[in-house]
């Protein structure tokens, strides 16, 4: 069954879910109950790259409309006015385009903008220098991008990190008269803050294809003269609709004829025989990957995986996908166990894996090492019974079970740290569920993995960072499963 139009509820898909595969012609799957499909053993596929060119072209179209005041000039001329001086525009030639994020669609936008002779600056912590050179863009930090850009486009998923990445604070850092284009996700921009900036002239124009609430009917940005809006048309061209339809049909045909799985959203490639053996390791790999991903801050170059002891005797390919999906899940919106290796490859992340049948300190262990442009992070985990256990982080021995909300702290192994930490959390009425410590040597570097009953605020993180012995504090979240 393939489709891309009407939203459907799980109760209306009973017959469909008895089939082997559901195909979605496009990227969005809000019209498919993936949980119900998974429960019924049905693979859900989509076509995330079939409309990339169309969406990128829409971004360029919005930017050009904004630069030359085309929508307002069109309306004015239809009304019989002839306001040439009022709608004087600006050239794109030699202007600085600041791109926040540079994935698949972003790289196409960069290519088109380069053809317009724009200077392209990119903020993307996960874009390697090698990939930046390949697509001919210059990496900069976010503050620099905000300060120097004439046009700013958004190319990131909506996550906790990117939500309202454009707000009053970031707008203050921008050039006077900057123009902002958002085709990516509603919620990336604080719309009230943008409205104020448009009225004041700080932002001389904005063009949006997406909004915080859709369908958007009473948005605060509507009616503003300097605002160009379209109703989520990014993927709406005849060519894109045809491309995604052909792609999803080919994917489904390949699966039904020879078992090939492409762009599946809800299931790794695991045989019925392997499934019960791999089940506890899948959970362990998800936790290892998520932990490594949340303590890795810059663009990843190399991902090294080692399976030791009992796990080395199993089919480890699905486990590699789970590890990479967990690693990338905190920074990317649509990562799953099937597409994670492809996403990593597209971002020039080199994945290597090895097997060591001989047991080491544990009868079974999985090691994940992540190399970035600045540092290396490692996480090792094992199973106690069938329960996941983290046994090493950043080359420091520790034994920890992971809960939904955690704190990861690096500190100096000196007296007073635990007492200060406990007092601050107690004052904030944050209860500690478990507390795990590890250190390299007496008085040396130490780490702590602390499970707490609820997420902590940014203000509390700042307070914890002020403890004299503390080097860094990171809130971790393991509540949402990727499988």
Identify the role of each PLM range.
Residues 44-45, 121, 177-295, 312, ...:
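Rossmann-like dinucleotide-binding domain for NAD(H)/NADP(H)
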Residues 125-220:
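Rossmann-like adenosine-cofactor binding region
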Residues 1-17:
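Single conserved hydrophobic/aromatic residue that forms the stacking wall/gate
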Residues 95-96, 119, 302:
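Residues that mark the start of a beta-strand
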Residues 269-271, 276-483:
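A conserved regulatory-domain signal marking ACT and ACT-like small-molecule sensing domains
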Residues 40-42, 48-96, 100, 104, ...:
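Phosphate-binding beta-alpha-beta segment of Rossmann-like dinucleotide-binding domains, i.e.
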Residues 25-26, 41-53, 124, 142-143, ...:
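Short beta->alpha connector loops at strand-helix junctions that form conserved
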């Amino acid at each position: 069954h393939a489709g891309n139009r009407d939203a459907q509820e799980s109760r209306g898909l009973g017959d469909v879910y008895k089939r082997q595969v559901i195909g979605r012609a496009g990227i969005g799957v809000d019209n498919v109950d993936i949980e119900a499909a998974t429960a019924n053993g049905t693979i859900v596929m989509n076509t995330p790259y079939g409309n990339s060119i169309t969406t990128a072209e829409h971004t360029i179209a919005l930017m050009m409309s904004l630069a030359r005041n085309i929508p307002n000039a069109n309306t004015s001329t239809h009304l019989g006015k002839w306001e040439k001086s009022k709608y004087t525009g600006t050239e794109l030639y030699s202007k600085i385009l600041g791109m926040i994020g540079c994935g698949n669609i972003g790289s196409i936008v960069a290519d088109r903008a380069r053809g317009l002779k724009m200077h392209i600056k990119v903020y993307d912590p996960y874009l390697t220098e090698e990939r930046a050179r390949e697509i001919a863009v210059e990496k900069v930090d976010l503050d620099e991008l905000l300060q120097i850009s004439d046009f700013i486009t958004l190319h990131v998923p909506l996550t906790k990190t990117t939500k309202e990445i454009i707000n009053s604070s970031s707008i203050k850092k921008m050039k006077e008269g900057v123009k902002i284009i958002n085709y990516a996700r509603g919620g990336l921009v604080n719309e009230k803050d943008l409205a104020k900036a448009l009225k004041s002239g700080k932002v001389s124009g904005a063009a949006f294809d997406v909004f915080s609430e859709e369908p958007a009917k009473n948005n605060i940005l509507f009616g503003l003269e300097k605002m160009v809006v379209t109703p989520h048309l990014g993927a709406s061209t005849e060519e894109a609709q045809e491309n995604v339809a052909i792609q999803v049909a080919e994917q489904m045909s390949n699966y039904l004829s020879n078992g090939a799985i492409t762009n599946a959203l809800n299931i790794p490639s695991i045989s019925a025989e392997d499934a019960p053996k791999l089940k506890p390791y899948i959970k362990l790999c998800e936790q290892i990957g998520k932990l490594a991903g949340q303590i890795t801050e810059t663009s990843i170059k190399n991902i090294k995986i080692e399976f030791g002891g009992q796990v080395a005797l199993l089919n480890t390919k699905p486990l590699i996908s789970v590890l990479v999906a967990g690693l990338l899940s905190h920074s990317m919106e649509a990562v799953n166990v099937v597409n994670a290796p492809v996403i990593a490859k597209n971002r020039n992340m080199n994945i290597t894996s090895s097997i060591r049948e001989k047991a080491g300190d544990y009868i079974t262990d999985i090691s994940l090492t992540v190399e970035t442009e600045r540092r290396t992070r490692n996480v090792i985990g094992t199973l106690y019974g069938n329960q996941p256990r983290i046994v090493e982080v950043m080359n420091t021995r520790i034994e920890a079970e992971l809960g939904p909300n955690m704190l990861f702290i690096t500190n100096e192994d000196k007296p007073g740290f635990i007492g200060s930490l406990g007092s601050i959390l107690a004052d904030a009425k944050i209860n500690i569920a478990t507390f795990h410590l590890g250190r390299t040597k007496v008085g040396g570097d130490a780490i702590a993995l602390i499970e707490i009953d609820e997420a902590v605020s940014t203000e509390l993180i700042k307070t914890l960072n002020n403890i004299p012995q503390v080097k860094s504090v990171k809130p971790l979240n393991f509540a949402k499963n990727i499988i």
